[in-house]
Amino acid sequence: MNNERRQILKGAGAAAVVAVAAGAGLLKPGNVFAADWNKAAFEAKDVATAMAGIGATGAAESDQIVVDAPNIAENGSRVPVKVTSKIANTEHIIILAEKNTNPLIADFALSNGADGFISTAIKLGATGNVRAVVKAGGKVYTAAKEVKVTIGGCGG
Amino acid sequence: MSGIRIKAAMSGDNAVVKCLMQHPMETGFRKDAKTGQLIPAHFINHVTATVAGKTVLDAQWGGAISANPFLEFRVAGAKSGDQVVISWEDNKGEKDSADATIA
Amino acid sequence: MKKFILALASLGIVFGAIAAHASPESDRMKVVNFLEHKYPDIKFDDYVYGALAFDPDAKSQYDSIMDFPPFLDVIDQGKKMWETPFKNGKTYAECMPNGGKMIAGNYPMYDEKLGKVVTFEDLINQCRVKNGEQPYSNGDMKTMGVLTSYARTLSDGMKMNIKVDSPGAVKAFDNGKNLFYKRHGQLNFACASCHLEAAGNRLRSEILSPVVGQAVHFPVFRGGSNLVTLQERFVGCFKMIRQVPDQPGSTRFNDLEYFMSYMSNGLPLHASVFRK
């Protein structure tokens, strides 16, 4: 029990360090990518830690981001999600599912003419927000859409 | 043979690139229905895409991208005939790569 | 006694002739009219989408996933099975009518010589046996399931065209019809309870798909990966109403498929698709 707590604290600490480093501009997003997989952020078990891990704490809600996801997922194992960012010079599109065991799903760095657009399919463990985070021009923006997940199904 | 399928075509001024990758994308949280044992995590954690030799997408993934991942992105300034290369690497160090020409 | 049965049988024929309105075609029209009356906004051709036709949110997910289906690899595996010759060097294509193309909509077909319904899966097994191979179990998704997930795509676009045109065929059709309308299982449901009377309604979180259109799109890949054939789906339905299911390929299931496929006559085939 104690051990577990210690590990969570350690994880949170590491994420906080990354967040501080990112916030201070010590790590450029591009460098983070060319380097290692963002373990602290991907293994975070709550949204706040995951957001901190990707340097998105305090991201501003934006209506310039459209999260196109279903109201009710046909099947939680494959939920189509499209994120469109109308924010100029979108450098990153990040997708999180707030109720997943590990909320952070993917971080897409876009460059050399790639539009502010990503379409993919994700797993959702429970009803909750699918959140998109956009990084552009040194700022961080976010928007979310709730997707309901039901169990069962007839498959007809 | 690569396990990545790519469809790339121009739509107006943008190249629309769609791809499907063969991968189980095991989160590590799922139990084997027969044995009750956890299935070890096995997922793509890094994806890159280049168009005409320039990196347009560099992504990190967790295990919650669906099995046999689908990915679509759009690139301005690309043209018909440009080569698209998509590559992935997973948490076990396995790799795959495929290329296609924008139609 | 024998005379009595004979008399009953002839009476049946006479009665059948008088009650001409109870033909398979009038049965189908009744079902189609019932649905069209209840759901005037749904186009006949959209019945191929099943429950998705009633739910734009679900349909748009289907469209997204079908844009690049995650199960293409399984279909490729089925293609390889289809193209790999038997030990005697012959292939499925050589053994089947029209090389196996644009024929699935004719099945199930009533075979007068065998005196029973032959499904597309049975046709595949007939080919296998004729060429010295062991038949597949109709319920084995790894063999019959994977093979048909490709073989049925060779008939994509063909319209379902089931014929019931002999006394034996009518008997098999009626057998399937009885199973469809008869209540059974611990929960006392008929197939018709959900897939005709309550079709389009919600059962908790599920929209119930109508019988019209159910036979044209199997096999399905549930959740994008779990391969399920039509008769394997029967097994699932039977379990849900707490009725001991048959093995896929049983006479009863084949007759039910015969009836259900007739109910989809005129709809275009489209295998193999995503379902929830």
Say what each PLM segment does:
Chain C
Residues 8-16:
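Bacterial N-terminal signal peptides
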Residues 21-73, 84-146, 153-157, 162-163, ...:
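Electron-transfer interface patches adjacent to heme c in soluble/periplasmic c-type cytochromes
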Residues 148, 173-174:
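Eukaryote-skewed repeat-based solenoidal scaffolds used as protein-protein interaction platforms
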Residues 174-184:
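A mid-sequence, solvent-exposed acidic-amphipathic segment
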